[in-house]
A protein has these predicted regions:
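Bacterial Sec-dependent N-terminal signal peptides
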Residues: 1-22
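Short secondary-structure capping/junction motifs at helix and strand boundaries
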Residues: 2-4, 74-78, 181-182
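N-terminal amphipathic, basic helical "cap/leader" segment at the start of enzyme domains
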Residues: 20-130
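Small-aliphatic-rich amphipathic alpha-helix that forms the alpha element of a beta-alpha
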Residues: 45, 64, 92, 132-143, ...
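Short, surface-exposed helix-loop/turn micro-motifs enriched in polar/charged residues
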Residues: 84, 183-186, 202
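Structured loops at beta-to-helix junctions and adjacent beta-edge loops in soluble globular domains
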Residues: 95-97, 137-139, 213
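Core catalytic architecture of nucleotide-activated donor-dependent transferases building glycoconjugates
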Residues: 109, 148-149
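A glycine-rich helix N-cap at a beta->alpha junction
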Residues: 199-216
Length: 216
């Protein structure tokens, strides 16, 4: 009995310390009306290579993430980006100078994953100097019939994850075009180092990254 009490006391202490040490950035409520209209956004859409170095404002970052894959129907938890079978398999990691964060659409905040700036692992030999890089990761385990370690059976989920990530990527591109922000979708990145730094599971696939900033 004493061992059981000690175990739960220790577990609660560890959980408490972990919660105290966690860093969370609360995002703003998204802006309902802003930017150019849809057809103007399509007209302005382009891949940007030259950026200013100043940070994104909290409102711009909040609106960007909501547009990318935020919850637009709170009554059922559905998102701005559709996903196969409503799996909601795509997660967004936000890498900045002060660390890399996980975007939690449910609580509308950023949760620190690592204090390491992982942007160089996505910039490679062609750094753009953007204040933010968004990493799109599909978690195949959210599909109902996902089978761990069974590559052949999971092939369809792998393909659907790629499509779902592409939809989120398009949301990012169109939001940026509509709001005078710059971005470009990229597939190149140091996947081995990123997987280790973010402690990703086997079921999680990194598909694309988006540098985002104010174009010069």
């Amino acid at each position: 009995m004493k061992r059981t009490i000690l175990f739960f006391t220790f577990t609660a202490l560890v959980f408490s310390l972990s919660a105290q040490n966690s860093v969370v950035i609360k995002l703003n409520e998204h802006t309902k009306y802003r930017g150019y209209n849809t057809m103007e956004a399509f007209q302005k859409r382009r891949s940007v290579n030259i950026y200013e170095t100043r940070d994104l404002s909290l409102q711009d970052l909040s609106d960007l993430l909501w547009a990318a894959n935020g919850i637009n129907r709170p009554e059922n938890g559905k998102k701005t980006a559709p996903s196969a079978m409503n799996s909601q398999d795509v997660d967004i990691y936000v890498s900045r100078a002060d660390g890399t964060y996980f975007y939690n659409a449910i609580t509308n905040d950023l949760v620190l994953v690592t204090t390491e700036d992982l942007r160089p692992l996505m910039d490679g030999n062609r750094p753009l100097g953007t204040p933010v890089i968004l990493l799109l990761v599909s978690d195949m385990s959210r599909y109902k019939n996902y089978s761990p370690g069974n590559a052949e059976r999971n092939k369809h989920f792998f393909e659907m994850g790629a499509i779902d990530a592409g939809i989120v990527s398009q949301n990012i591109s169109l939001f940026c075009a509509a709001n005078d922000l710059g971005t470009r979708p990229r597939a190149s990145m140091n996947q081995v180092a990123l997987r280790k730094a973010l402690n990703l599971k086997e079921s999680q696939v990194m598909w694309l990254n988006h540098p985002v900033g104010y174009p010069k």
